[in-house]
């Protein structure tokens, strides 16, 4: 029997969002717990974790303009079922009981800067009073719109070429569930493309398997 279903909120390869609520419902229907990895989606959507329905949602806050700190949301009913992993005197403290070494107080305090950053953007573009969740949604919409405007020319250009094929959706907009992560299948080797882009001032990080020559010399 399936006990735990783990899945990403969004593909980190083709940039396609998964239906978290639908997956969570399907898993819950058979009595399974769900764990959603949001690291590839969080910077593009600032998700409403409560509305998604998953039991666990986690991501790294450096993806959302914060420190290099892991953030995990666990529904209370599930958190109370999990075995304490911390000191015995923290067994009843939910935000401590799953952290064996104890909270990293400096990193946690630094996470407040993420809210300050979102509030600063909201004040600049909108101003006025609004609830924190409403401010976050408004800023997320601004950021997503900007991402789409930047990505559109690239997708149009790639779509016009016969030596490159976009993997995943070519359509933009929140309704398509597509975030600005682009994967390609190209006629040329990735190394040649990276070198060519570098000559035009485009930063490229190239990750490849060792070549036969490299393997033979090791």
Language-model features: locations:
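PLP-dependent aminotransferase class I/II
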Residues: 93-128
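Short amphipathic alpha-helices in soluble, non-transmembrane regions
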Residues: 194-199
């Amino acid at each position: 029997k399936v006990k735990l279903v783990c899945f990403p909120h969004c593909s980190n390869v083709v940039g396609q969002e998964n239906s978290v609520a639908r997956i969570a419902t399907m898993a819950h229907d058979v009595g399974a717990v769900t764990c959603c990895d949001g690291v590839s989606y969080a910077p593009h959507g600032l998700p409403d974790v409560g509305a998604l329905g998953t039991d666990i949602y986690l991501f790294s806050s450096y993806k959302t303009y914060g420190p290099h700190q892991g953030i995990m949301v666990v529904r209370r009913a599930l958190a109370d079922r999990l075995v304490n992993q911390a000191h015995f005197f923290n067994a009843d403290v939910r935000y401590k009981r799953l952290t064996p070494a104890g909270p990293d107080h400096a990193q946690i305090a630094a996470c407040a800067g993420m809210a300050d950053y979102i509030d600063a953007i909201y004040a600049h573009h909108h101003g006025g009073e609004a609830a924190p969740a409403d401010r976050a949604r408004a800023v997320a919409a601004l950021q997503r719109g900007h991402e789409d405007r930047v990505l559109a020319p690239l997708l149009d250009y790639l779509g016009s070429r016969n030596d490159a094929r976009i993997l995943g959706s070519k359509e933009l907009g929140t309704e398509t569930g597509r975030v600005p992560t682009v994967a390609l299948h190209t006629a040329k080797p990735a190394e040649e493309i990276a070198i060519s882009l570098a000559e035009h001032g485009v930063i490229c990080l190239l990750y490849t398997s060792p070549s036969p020559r490299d393997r033979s010399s090791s």
